[in-house]
């Protein structure tokens, strides 16, 4: 059987196109995961809100308070997601129930003990007219570099319990 030049031309022109269409047609939009609140890649947009539902104390000599499994804790179990609310001034003090605007949010990693342990964290920089000393909320956990994942909203909600809630900007 003899393949003509025209058949070869059609084959080499349309087969790559067909392969690209076949491969990409089943793939979801990669930007959709940034809009899915259940995705670990969810993008917290500026203008979102973090609502503190109860007053929390800042211990003496510290500039933060910690939350894990829906409770205020004195220290974090680093291998479970926990969050730290940072303030400008050393305690004793308190942060009163309020709504904070999230000015910027980012996710990142940093080495704790190379090559075995990394810190995976998400930080939200906060703003409040009534409490300008409240700086940020950082949610984090430690894991192996190949096993760890970005901190998801559902993990943050579990760590914060009913103490905080989120309202995400569209």
Language-model features: where?
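C-terminal motif of bacterial Sec signal peptides marking the signal peptidase cleavage site
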Residues: 23-26
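Short, conserved beta-turn/loop elements at beta-strand boundaries and strand-helix junctions
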Residues: 103-113
């Amino acid at each position: 059987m003899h393949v003509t030049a025209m058949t070869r031309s059609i084959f080499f022109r349309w087969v790559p196109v067909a392969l690209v269409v076949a491969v990409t047609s089943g793939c979801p939009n990669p930007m959709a995961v940034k809009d899915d609140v259940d995705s670990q890649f969810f993008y917290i947009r500026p203008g979102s809100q973090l609502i503190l539902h109860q007053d929390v104390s800042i211990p003496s000599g510290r500039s933060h308070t910690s939350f894990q499994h829906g409770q205020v804790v004195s220290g974090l179990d680093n291998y479970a997601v926990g969050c730290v609310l940072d303030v400008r001034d050393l305690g004793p003090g308190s942060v009163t129930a309020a709504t904070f605007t999230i000015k910027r949010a980012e996710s990142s990693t940093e080495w704790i003990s190379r090559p075995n342990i990394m810190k995976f964290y998400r930080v939200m920089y906060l703003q409040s007219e009534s409490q300008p000393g409240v700086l940020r909320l950082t949610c984090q956990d430690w894991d192996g570099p190949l096993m760890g994942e970005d901190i998801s909203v559902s993990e943050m909600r579990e760590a914060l319990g009913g103490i905080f809630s989120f309202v995400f900007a569209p």
